[in-house]
């Protein structure tokens, strides 16, 4: 959900690298059935999924089955998980271009010299990649990325990334597997529908393969003045606050109260329409909002926490991307 360690809304320019935003509605599947085929392996990953997307020209990629947790091909485009250190490096290079060169974030020490956006989570998580094979077969082919952190990966580090801003104890206690989405971005000229469908098909295949029960991550409102964001913050609190058992709260030292206006004075329809596409898209999928916002001065944003139980997913999304592929024909 989930840019950088978050699902971000930054980057709406069509002529520059941009952060990935989910569509405002679950995408309508193209003609043709989607298939999900489970393959058991003896490699590091206990099982894998090979997904043939319901897109024109879709076919299984020529990747060894042991690496196929996600592998979807449509024409020259492919979405799969990173398999090598070179794949991860390519994702880090793309993230640097988006977050620091385009969005103007302040690089951490060493990032500017290396021209890479890196942190300690990169070697433990899964990286979802979109590749355009017309650009080549190496790092230059990577045009989109999304970072996926499950319990096992977070345990090796000691915490989820969002724990730097929020008390995620209630999320960690959630029964079943949980997934933090972040560091999402798409390169210039690749925001057309096929790329977005590939990304969401890849996330869906991953979610169903690992039986994910809960997804979460941070999303951003532009600007660092909470008073200037009183309308969207108040709307999110009064209309989309998570139920108590799921309600993560911003850390005390970073907590910004979202209850800034009388809810009677809000226009829900107009406010929802004006929200950044990322947040609006997740709300339409059935997401909740945590308690409290967090100002991120490094990136010039005010963050909110998105929580999306898979059980609450909009049924149209399930129908489009769920595991029962044979019912996905248009």
Show which residues each predicted segment covers.
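Short, cationic low-complexity segments
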Residues: 324-330
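Conserved N-terminal entry element of GNAT/NAT acetyltransferase domains
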Residues: 33, 37-85
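Short amphipathic alpha-helix that is part of the acyltransferase structural core
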Residues: 68-143, 147-153
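Short hydrophobic/aromatic beta-strand or adjacent loop that forms the aromatic wall/cage
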Residues: 125-127, 301-305
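Acyl-donor binding region in acyl/amide transferases
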Residues: 148-288, 293-303, 313
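Long, contiguous binding/interaction regions
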Residues: 318
């Amino acid at each position: 959900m989930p840019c950088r360690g978050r699902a971000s809304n930054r980057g709406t320019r069509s002529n520059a690298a941009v952060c990935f935003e989910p569509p405002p509605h679950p995408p309508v599947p193209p003609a043709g059935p989607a298939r999900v085929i489970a393959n058991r392996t003896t490699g590091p990953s206990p099982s894998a999924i090979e997904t043939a997307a319901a897109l024109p020209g879709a076919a299984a990629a020529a990747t060894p089955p042991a690496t196929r947790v996600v592998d979807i091909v449509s024409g020259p485009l492919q979405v799969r998980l990173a398999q090598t250190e070179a794949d991860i490096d390519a994702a880090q290079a793309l993230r640097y271009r988006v977050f620091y060169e385009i969005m103007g974030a302040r690089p951490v020490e060493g990032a500017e010299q290396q021209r890479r956006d890196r942190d300690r989570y990169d070697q433990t998580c899964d990286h979802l990649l979109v590749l355009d094979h017309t650009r080549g077969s190496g790092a230059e082919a990577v045009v989109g990325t999304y970072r996926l952190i499950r319990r096992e990966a977070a345990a090796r580090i000691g915490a989820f990334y969002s724990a730097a801003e929020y008390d995620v104890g209630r999320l960690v206690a959630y029964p079943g597997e949980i997934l933090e989405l972040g560091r999402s971005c798409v390169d210039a000229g690749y925001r057309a529908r096929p790329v977005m469908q590939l990304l969401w098909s890849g996330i869906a295949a991953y979610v169903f393969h690992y039986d994910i029960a809960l997804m979460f991550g941070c999303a951003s409102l532009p600007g660092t003045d909470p008073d200037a964001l009183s309308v969207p913050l108040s709307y999110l609190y009064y209309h989309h606050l998570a139920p108590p058992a799921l309600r993560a709260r911003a850390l005390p030292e970073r907590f910004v109260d979202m209850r800034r206006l009388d809810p009677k004075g809000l226009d829900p329809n107009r406010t929802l329409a004006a929200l950044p596409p990322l947040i609006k898209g997740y709300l339409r999928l059935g997401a909740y909002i945590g308690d409290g916002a967090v100002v991120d001065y490094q990136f010039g944003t005010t963050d909110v926490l998105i929580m999306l139980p898979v059980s609450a997913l909009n049924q149209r999304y399930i129908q489009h991307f769920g595991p029962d592929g044979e019912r996905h024909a248009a």
